[in-house]
Amino acid sequence: MDQARACQISPAILKFRPDIIIAFQPESACCITQYFMDRPPIITMMHASPAAFLKHPQTAFLAESDLTVVLLPEYVEQVRQLYGVTHAISIPNAIEEQPPSLYESIKKEKTIICVARISRSEKRQHLLIEAFAELQSKFPDWKVEVWGDTSIDSDYIGELKGLIHRLGLERQIRICGQTNTVSAVIARASIFALPSPKEGFPLALCESLAVGVPVVCFRSCPGANHLVRDHENGLLAEDSVDSFALSLETLMQDEALRQQLGRQGIEDMKAYAPEKIWNQWESVLDNVIRQHEPHQP
């Protein structure tokens, strides 16, 4: 964000005279800290893992924010080490509690679902396809649905379709495109699979847990491995297609285990209820504003 953008923001700051500013990304914080000398306190949010911002020059201004808010507790130390931030806390995203009618009465399909941006490097849906290929003969009545925007990376979409064709899995694996009813789509599935190498705070994964669908992801995946607790609300696979396939198989062949992990996932997500998260934010805002009030003689 450059000086021109700062000029766009300036009238609003001068007009409203805010008690505090929340920058939703480091670029915004850079603009405000660099071009506004007489400013209210600023809180900078990071909506991904701190390492994801390493190539952004604007992160040099993070240390000038009054507080940096990250999504998970383990990110607090990371942001301190990477960017010299001294004041950092974690506040997660809010996850809406879903009505029991969405998941208690619905008939579960023998479906493994992946809802994520379709990306070779960031989400690696091809690993799910390769893992399922190891299982399809043993579980011919199971299917895989890959949901995500198909317009962003047409080359990778073509690669996935070619892989499905080569493996002879057209009848069992479907690339579905986008949906505006994520929770409802996930709720009818039996397993949520996310083969990402890293995450910030994966919302679709949380929505899966919130409707009682157990998750399979990689143990090494930051973000996901904080939310998924092995053999409690999902399974954590080691870094190989074979291990991912084994975790899928463990759930595919054990409906009672799927139900047990699903129930725990619903309970776990209650900690992220909106009212709890907004209360945390309200407390943080009050504290930061109070710390910057002029001291009375």
What are these regions (language model features)?
Residues 110, 119-137, 144, 158:
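A conserved mid-protein helix/loop that constitutes part of the nucleotide-sugar donor-binding site
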Residues 219, 229-231, 235-242, 250-255:
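Conserved acidic donor-binding segment of nucleotide-sugar-dependent glycosyltransferases
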Residues 115, 143-158:
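Glycosyltransferase donor-sugar binding loop
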Residues 157-177:
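Nucleotide-activated donor-binding/catalytic signature segment of Leloir-type glycosyltransferases, i.e.
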Residues 2-5, 23-29:
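Short His-centered aromatic/hydrophobic patch
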Residues 74, 94:
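Carbohydrate-associated surface elements
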